[in-house]
């Protein structure tokens, strides 16, 4: 159990740092009211989790590595709370078009990315 806690914590440490760097970098190039940085990490994380579980189903993966990547790294790299807060701000500002677009893009692109990732090792 201690090993699992340590690998999840280490994965979270790496994921949180990469999330911050990725969001800042993407938003620097796409400075719009929709946070494309958040969209980027959520889509990429969805793709990676699709890859991970497809690979694990077909080829096997150690429980520690699976915990490191899924719960640790991806748990910290992707962010639903930030997505929710950004949508709240869009609603409060009356920017309903960007509010709807942000939700649609995040939900459908993340689902599509997870499906694509899963197909790779199927």
Curated annotation (Swiss-Prot):
Pfam family membership, one: CRCB
Main location: membrane
GO CC list: plasma membrane
Membrane-crossing residue ranges in chain numbering: 6-26, 33-53, 60-80, 101-121
Binding site residues for Na(+): 75, 78
Catalytic activity: fluoride(in) = fluoride(out)
The keyword Phosphoprotein is annotated on this UniProt entry: no
Domain of life (superkingdom): Bacteria
Localisation per UniProt entry: Cell inner membrane
GO function terms (MF aspect): fluoride channel activity; metal ion binding
Summary of the function given for this chain in its UniProt record: Fluoride-specific ion channel. Important for reducing fluoride concentration in the cell, thus reducing its toxicity.
PANTHER family listed in its UniProt record: FLUORIDE EXPORT PROTEIN 1-RELATED
Family: Belongs to the fluoride channel Fluc/FEX (TC 1.A.43) family.
Protein name, entry field: Fluoride-specific ion channel FluC
Organismal lineage: Bacteria, Pseudomonadati, Campylobacterota, Epsilonproteobacteria, Campylobacterales
């Amino acid at each position: 159990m201690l090993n699992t806690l340590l690998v999840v914590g280490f994965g979270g440490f790496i994921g949180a740092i990469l999330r911050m760097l990725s969001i800042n970098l993407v938003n620097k190039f796409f400075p719009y009211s929709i946070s494309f940085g958040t969209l980027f990490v959520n889509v990429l994380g969805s793709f990676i989790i699709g890859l991970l579980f497809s690979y694990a189903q077909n080829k096997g993966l150690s429980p520690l590595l699976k915990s490191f990547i899924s719960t640790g790294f991806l748990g910290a790299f992707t962010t639903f709370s930030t997505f929710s807060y950004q949508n709240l701000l869009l609603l409060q500002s009356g920017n309903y078009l960007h509010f709807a677009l942000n939700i649609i893009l995040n939900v459908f692109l993340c689902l599509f990315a997870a499906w694509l990732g899963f197909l790779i090792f199927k």
